[in-house]
Design a protein with these regions (language model features):
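Short coil/turn segments at beta-strand junctions that form active-site/ligand-binding loops
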Residues: 1-2, 70-73, 97, 161-162
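Aromatic pocket-lining residues of Rossmann-like dinucleotide-binding sites
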Residues: 26, 89-90
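Gly/Ala-rich beta-loop-alpha elbow adjacent to hydrolase catalytic centers
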Residues: 77-82, 86
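Catalytic nucleophile-loop/oxyanion-hole region of alpha/beta-hydrolase
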Residues: 14, 41-71
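Glycine-rich His-Gly loop
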Residues: 6-10, 80, 168
């Protein structure tokens, strides 16, 4: 069997359009797909397990769950900080065979400043399929402290599995030049530089389809 684990970006729901789109197409391609609610944040609203370290444990647990089925392929596909986590997990977990990193940040040095005086940071996210509704999450500084323990730029230096890095050239959240830092350190990555697309391509079905078509090309290699 072939397994694909989909990793949302910062505070993103696993039920956002892009992940649902990827799920449907990957299922058609014969993958068993799970869209992970990282740290169970959307399920519980509790940020206690919302750290990269817990995300890695969660990914490890899901891979172990399928071990008896002897998957010949395990793909980690993440967007934004989910892409960051996918690379870190892929570099550490032997069973992972491919990584798809969409708009991954090289670090969160600038974003960390949004946690004023190292307190909690409150953010609002739209509810899937209900754009007029929202949920609010308060993330403690412990998230930043944990995140800073990981370096994706260092991780890719010793990463020799197939790696796709997707760069949205109109991205203003994770500027292309930041993601290019990862590309420079990586070993022969499959790089897609998509013009006229921003970080939140999830809000457009057409853009989601474009991204999925690029993912499909990579998986077929």
């Amino acid at each position: 069997m072939k397994l694909a684990l989909l990793l949302p970006g910062y505070l993103d729901s696993p039920d956002y359009l892009h992940l649902v789109t990827f799920d449907k197409r990957l299922t058609q391609l014969g993958y068993t797909v799970e869209r992970l609610d990282l740290g169970d944040l959307w399920k519980t609203g509790d940020p206690a397990k919302y750290t990269v370290s817990h995300f890695l444990d969660q990914i490890r647990e899901r891979i172990a769950y399928y071990k008896s089925q002897k998957p010949e392929e395990i793909v980690l596909l993440g967007h934004s900080r989910g892409a960051f986590t996918a690379i870190i997990a892929g570099s550490r977990l032997a069973g992972v065979t491919r990584v798809v990193a969409l708009c991954p940040p090289a670090d969160i040095t600038q974003s960390a400043k949004k946690w004023i005086n190292q307190g909690s940071r409150t953010s609002t996210k739209d509810v899937p399929d209900k754009p007029s509704e929202s949920r609010t999450f308060s993330i403690p500084y412990a998230y930043v402290q944990d995140f800073l323990n990981y370096s994706v730029v260092e991780a890719v230096k010793t990463f020799h599995k197939p790696l796709m890095i997707f760069i949205a050239l109109s991205d203003r959240v994770v500027p292309p030049e930041h993601t290019e830092q990862i590309v420079k350190s990586a070993n022969n990555p499959h790089v897609v530089r998509q013009p006229n697309m921003g970080h939140d391509f999830r809000k457009s079905q057409a853009d989601c389809d474009i991204v999925m078509s690029e993912i499909e090309k990579f998986l077929a290699q």
